Design a protein with these regions (language model features):
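FAD-binding beta-loop-beta segment adjacent to the flavin cofactor pocket
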Residues: 250, 284-342
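A conserved FAD-binding loop/helix module that cradles the flavin
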Residues: 1-3, 8, 268-273, 325-328, ...
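Flavin (primarily FAD) binding-site architecture
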Residues: 260-277
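Conserved beta-strand-loop-beta-strand element in the redox core of flavoprotein oxidoreductases
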Residues: 213, 230-253, 258
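A conserved beta-strand/loop element that lines the FAD pocket in flavoprotein oxidoreductases
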Residues: 217-229
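Central beta-strand plus flanking loop segment that forms part of the substrate or channel wall
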Residues: 117-135, 199-200, 270, 277-306
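Conserved N-terminal/central alpha/beta ligand/cofactor-binding core
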Residues: 2-108, 112-113, 117-137, 158-161, ...
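Short hydrophobic core segments
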Residues: 252-265, 328
Length: 364
């Protein structure tokens, strides 16, 4: 067992180093091995503060997936790890859904129950149908409204309280709820709350975006949430930024320096062909390493590709004409998991490089 744990730790370290080497490939000053280790801890800390991770070093967790299966993983978000059916005995999971959501909770219950019985596990999945939304919504819209509106969170808690007695643990849709609110919800309902794995992490970027925004706000830099943005040029500089806010209202921002983040952009699924790229990042240079798929070093082995904004070594967006703006920088790169069967990209890892970007901005 001891040797297995050592091998697993080495696999995680190798994985983290590979991720960082990919992210640093285009840099002029490639860090030394010692810098890699320090940078890995910084990246992990930033990621884990916004997306807490549970790691199992002895046996893999067996977690329900929205594909109607169970996946064997050594690491998962903390809220997902609570649904490990290997570590529960005769637990009834209440699978929450709403008829207006794009989430087939009834069908998932049937598949998970059939599979659990076949595999000899005692976990039971009980459908809990609530009435929360009045119109048809995808889960991303539900998650954003819950993250941003306190009244919606209170109403959601009240609705769940009416049904909580039907189960031992509530299994919500993959909403990527913040850890602090998960704790509040568990305290209010007196029940554990968890989420299933999702083949495409639809809303993790909401929380990562908030972590990036918090970093900049502490530095005294205003942060705007945009649905779409358009850059206005003047003499090699960005003169102003026009953008649609969350209410779809056109706004204008002017500043001496601009920093763009990619949390919202890279949290969504994208067609590998690239047909859906322009929707939420119009006018920005996007890239994907089409010909390169590398693999993680620990189970389950998955393919990954790098996508995001095309940047120079000093974090300037690099447009097709090799033109860059003097007063524009961008943060963030995404190592995206690839679903070869469905030809989709999911959020594998978004590295928060705001600190390094800020250092570049501070240089004369």
């Amino acid at each position: 067992m001891f040797s297995e744990n050592i091998s697993l730790r080495n696999a995680y370290r190798q994985y983290g180093t590979e991720v960082l080497r990919e992210l640093f490939l285009d840099w002029e000053d490639v860090p030394s091995d010692d810098s890699f280790v320090r940078s890995l801890h910084q990246v992990q800390k930033a990621l884990w503060e916004s997306l807490p991770i549970n790691v199992s070093e002895d046996h893999p967790m067996l977690l329900p997936s929205t594909q109607g299966t169970f996946r064997s993983l050594y690491a998962a978000q903390a809220v997902q790890a609570k649904a490990d059916i290997r570590r529960v005995d005769k637990v009834a999971f209440g699978v929450v859904g709403d008829a207006h959501w794009s989430y087939p909770h009834l069908q998932l219950c049937e598949r998970w129950n059939a599979l659990a019985e076949k595999m000899g596990f005692s976990a039971v999945f009980v459908p809990i149908t609530i009435t929360f939304s009045q119109t048809h919504l995808n889960l991303e819209a539900v998650a954003v409204s819950l993250e941003r509106t306190e009244s919606e969170r209170l109403r959601f808690t009240d609705v769940l309280r009416l049904e909580a007695s039907k189960c031992d643990t509530l299994l919500l849709p993959p909403l990527s709820l913040s850890q602090s609110w998960v704790h509040e919800l568990e305290k209010a309902l007196d029940k554990p709350v968890c989420e299933p794995l999702c083949s495409r992490e639809t809303t993790a970027g909401v929380r990562l975006e908030r972590a990036i925004a918090s970093t900049f706000q502490k530095m005294g830099i205003p942060v705007f949430n945009t649905e779409q943005c358009k850059l206005r040029w003047s003499g090699g500089n960005i003169d102003k930024l026009e953008f649609l806010d969350s209410a779809r209202q056109l706004r204008t921002a002017t500043a001496d320096q601009y920093v763009l983040t990619t949390g919202r952009f890279s949290s969504r699924g994208f067609n590998i062909i690239g047909k859906r790229w322009g929707a939420s990042a119009s006018g920005l240079p996007l890239f994907i390493e089409r010909g390169k798929i590398w693999q993680t070093a620990f189970p389950p082995v998955e393919g990954y590709q790098k996508l995001g904004l095309a940047l120079t070594a000093d974090f300037r967006p690099k447009f097709s004409s090799e033109e860059t703006a003097n007063n524009l920088r961008a943060t963030g790169s995404c190592i995206g998991g690839v679903d070869i069967g469905k030809r989709k990209l999911g959020l594998g890892l978004l590295a928060l490089l705001g600190r390094e970007c800020a250092k570049k901005m501070a240089k004369p």
